[in-house]
């Protein structure tokens, strides 16, 4: 059976406004944006239609950020999964998802999860604009990142002026015990993507 509070909230919303494009202002969306900013410390919210679109937006933000000094490389982790669009597939660190769909956009590099020396090497090239990672890798298992690796990633991003981006499409919205999984690691990302649990 469904939670009665959830049923009441959904019923109320359906009698008010069932669905509309993100092009139009709606009060519930504004309230949600405010709540997300309050809970995360972020300053802006972008509402899209899917996790892939959220990650695609994060990739664009990183590229725009790096444009000022010709940095366009985005680093993700080996065995990551970031979506099924061409750019998010390029960001996905698994060869099996790359078969049959190339060529991909240039500028994506992969580093092994929990390998601090490899992370240091790739983030110190002067070409990286963003690091996108999942706190728990969910493709092929449930593999949480090592807290020391995550904290070092944040430190390296700050030292090298790289955007730290966290993909919380699978883990966000209370699915790991906190609103977002990154909170359990004591870090403060520049960009957080979310989707499924928010719906």
Please name every model-derived segment.
Residues 1-199:
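Conserved N-terminal phosphate-binding loop of PLP-dependent enzymes in the Aspartate aminotransferase
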């Amino acid at each position: 059976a469904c939670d009665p509070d959830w049923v009441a909230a959904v019923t109320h919303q359906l009698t008010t406004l069932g669905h509309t494009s993100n092009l139009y202002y709606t009060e519930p969306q504004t309230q949600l944006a405010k709540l997300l900013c309050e809970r995360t410390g972020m300053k802006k919210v972008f509402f899209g239609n899917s996790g892939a679109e959220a990650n695609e937006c994060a990739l664009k933000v990183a590229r725009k950020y790096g444009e000022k000094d010709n940095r366009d490389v985005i680093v993700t982790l080996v065995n990551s999964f970031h979506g099924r669009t061409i750019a998010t597939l390029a960001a996905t660190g698994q060869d099996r998802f790359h078969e049959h769909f190339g060529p991909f956009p240039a500028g994506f590099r992969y580093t092994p999860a929990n390998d601090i020396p490899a992370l240091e090497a790739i983030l110190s090239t002067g070409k990286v604009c963003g690091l996108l990672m999942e706190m728990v890798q969910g493709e092929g298992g449930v593999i949480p990142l090592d807290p020391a690796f995550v904290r070092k990633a944040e430190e390296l991003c700050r030292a090298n002026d790289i955007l730290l981006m966290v993909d919380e499409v699978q883990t966000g919205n209370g699915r790991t015990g906190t609103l977002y999984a990154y909170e359990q690691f004591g870090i403060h990302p520049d960009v957080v993507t979310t989707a499924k649990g928010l719906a």
